[in-house]
Amino acid sequence: MSRIGKRIIEIPSSVQASVEGSKLLFKNSKEKHELETHNRVKITLENNQLSFQPVGEDAQSRAYWGTYGALANNIVIGLSTGFSKTLEVNGVGYKVALGNKTLDLSLGFSHPVKYPIPAGIEMVVEKNTITIKGSDKQKVGQVAAEIRSFRPPEPYKGKGVKYSNEVIIRKAGKTAKK
């Protein structure tokens, strides 16, 4: 039995939800998201409470049950409070600047890296810290992973782009021969 799937999702007053067949529509004052569900899951929306039930007893139906419960919960949290990820840029000469709809990164390459900011994502840059905010959890995580992939942290000095809560396992350098 899915513990995530059987959870009832409370929809706050700032978010409106509606069910149209197998499609769930969520919106707040600024944005709207929709979630297309599989026919193996039954959706129930009553008194601002959203719940899912598997249609069959097979493993596939139970898997969809938990998946759609988690996806719907992420949309509700995203529209009510939002998601954010913080990246830190460490290294001599590594700089970050916010341009016009682009993030300009100097990461020790022969050229600056220009990352176009996708729609629905907001970025704040303070010194060498990048904060990525948005209502779509998947998109916020994807943008953070793409920016980190330009220069992942290396294990010797820790230079590169890392998540703020990421712990880099450091390696010892070479020792001199005697």
Swiss-Prot record:
Superkingdom classification of source: Bacteria
InterPro entries from the UniProt entry: Ribosomal_uL6-like, Ribosomal_uL6-like_a/b-dom_sf, Ribosomal_uL6_a/b-dom, Ribosomal_uL6_bac-type, Ribosomal_uL6_CS
Record keywords: Ribonucleoprotein, Ribosomal protein, RNA-binding, rRNA-binding
SUPFAM superfamilies associated with the record: Ribosomal protein L6
Entry keyword DNA-binding: no
Family note: Belongs to the universal ribosomal protein uL6 family.
Subunit structure: Part of the 50S ribosomal subunit.
UniProt-recorded name of the protein: Large ribosomal subunit protein uL6
Species of the source: Helicobacter pylori (strain P12)
Lineage of origin: Bacteria, Pseudomonadati, Campylobacterota, Epsilonproteobacteria, Campylobacterales
